[in-house]
UniProtKB/Swiss-Prot annotation:
Belongs to the Glu/Leu/Phe/Val dehydrogenases family. Its EC number is 1.4.1.4. It comes from Neurospora sitophila. The modification N-acetylserine is found at S2. GO terms for biological process: glutamate biosynthetic process. Keywords: Acetylation, NADP, Oxidoreductase. This is NADP-specific glutamate dehydrogenase. The lineage of its organism: Eukaryota, Fungi, Dikarya, Ascomycota, Pezizomycotina.
Length: 454
């Protein structure tokens, strides 16, 4: 990669995977997979285009649009669209690369991709967002389709934006097909899709608790970051299962519970309304049971916690914050966001797992812990293909099965390729990375994307 422009986010994601594979027995048993990794690390296709739209004052505005179609060996490209001023090719390549292996862990037939634009929806009128989405889809529709590439939502892209984009696609392509997921229920969407990533995260961590002998969620104190869909629905499910939610956050700061009762369902409903109006948590009218900490992430302010769930954005847990969580008694960390922990933070957690054995913290990477969102997107694709709608109970049951399989697949793969010392919990980061990876080179080899020397 030395001859290419610096892509720090993508390089971090690549190095994390490569480090895991090199430090397992996978390459000893299958040295040819080094070739597969080199091939899989380059996207099949990168589409970059301009998006020209008109603001409410009649002025011409222009943004950069992208779609990284990373790997289609397991199925159509699948991954979200992100609208945020920070969007660039490095971030989308990192997200698309992670998406390949996350999608593989679901067991569904989906490849990996990611897209978006450096457009900031904050402060924009509904009409401006509609005009931008239509202009964005005017180019993107040429490159996607129900059996080619099926985008979904991500940061800055919710049900409203998916609706505008789907309408623009339908008009441009003259087809009504399952080309986007996260659609409205009356026009091809799936029940539990908005809740899926948060619910799936909670289901996954439930298996971590059970396997390690820590019991249920009842009485556990849980720190969350973020206040979007993932954090909102994870918090609601945690409260339903008896846990105490002690924090939420956004880019302006953190809400931290000061009393024993934690953040309540009523608080979360109010936060949902704030976020629906595209406002900051600074407008939340908090009572005495929570405090607002300006400009902070929650990890060093939550006091004693049992579980930490980063659900905001990449690299939101630093080495110092990881050490702070250990000092606060945290025993479980699972990423609801993609690459939520820095490499240094992961190293802190993994070293603790090896040193403290049964008393250690247990860390789960986002590609496994947050795969519930794309899993239900895959279930939405299946429903669209059959022109059927499953009940909420049916979708939730399938989601639970997928998260259970993702957990045990990573766990058992770790036991095979990254053996733990006696009394040590298996490495879920190693197991999940390897389990997600091995499916992809096998399919690529069968399809002639790489080959071994005779």
């Amino acid at each position: 990669m030395s001859n290419l422009p610096s892509e720090p986010e993508f390089e971090q994601a690549y190095k994390e995977l490569a480090y895991t594979l090199e430090n397992s027995s996978l390459f000893q048993k299958h040295p040819e997979y080094r070739t597969a990794l080199a091939v899989a690390s380059i996207p099949e296709r990168v589409i970059q285009f301009r998006v020209v739209w008109e603001d409410d004052n009649g002025n011409v505005q222009v943004n950069r649009g992208y779609r990284v179609q990373f790997n289609s060996a397991l199925g159509p490209y699948k991954g979200g669209l992100r609208l945020h001023p920070s969007v660039n090719l490095s971030i989308l390549k990192f997200l698309g690369f992670e998406q390949i292996f996350k999608n593989a862990l679901t067991g569904l037939s989906m490849g990996g991709g990611k897209g978006g634009a450096d457009f900031d929806p904050k402060g924009k009128s509904d009409a401006e967002i509609r005009r931008f989405c239509c202009a964005f889809m005017a180019e993107l529709h040429k490159h996607i389709g129900a059996d080619t590439d099926v985008p979904a939502g991500d940061i800055g892209v919710g049900g409203r934006e998916i609706g505008y984009m789907f309408g623009a696609y339908r008009k441009a392509a003259n087809r009504f097909e399952g080309v986007l997921t996260g659609k409205g229920l009356s026009w091809g969407g799936s029940l539990i899709r908005p809740e899926a990533t948060g619910y799936g995260l909670v289901y996954y961590v439930g298996h971590m608790l059970e396997y390690s002998g820590a019991g249920s969620y009842a009485g556990k104190r849980v720190a969350l970051s973020g206040s979007g869909n993932v954090a909102q629905y994870a918090a609601l499910k945690l409260i339903e299962l008896g846990a105490t939610v002690v924090s939420l956050s956004d880019s302006k700061g953190a809400l931290v519970a000061t009393g024993e009762s934690g953040i309540t369902v009523e608080d979360i409903n109010a936060i949902m309304a704030i976020k629906e109006a595209r406002q900051s948590l600074t407008t939340f009218q908090h009572a005495g049971h929570v405090k607002w900490i300006e400009g902070a992430r929650p990890w060093l302010h939550v006091g004693k916690v049992d579980i930490a769930l980063p659900c905001a954005t990449q690299n939101e847990v630093s080495k110092e914050e990881a050490e702070g969580l250990l000092a606060a008694g945290c025993k479980f960390v699972a990423e609801g966001s993609n690459m939520g922990c820095t490499l240094e933070a992961i190293e802190v957690f993994e070293n603790n797992r090896k040193e403290k054995k049964g008393e250690a913290v247990w860390y789960a990477p986002g590609k496994a812990a947050n795969c519930g969102g794309v899993a239900v997107s895959g279930l939405e694709m299946a429903q669209n293909s059959q022109r059927l709608n499953w009940t909420q109970a049916e979708v939730d049951e399938k989601l639970k099965d997928i998260m259970k399989n993702a957990f045990f697949n990573g766990l058992n793969t770790a036991k095979t390729y990254a053996e733990a010392a006696e009394g040590e919990l298996p490495s879920l980061v190693a197991g999940s990375n390897i389990a997600g990876f091995v499916k992809v080179p096998q399919a690529m080899h069968d399809q002639g994307d790489w080959w071994s020397k005779n």
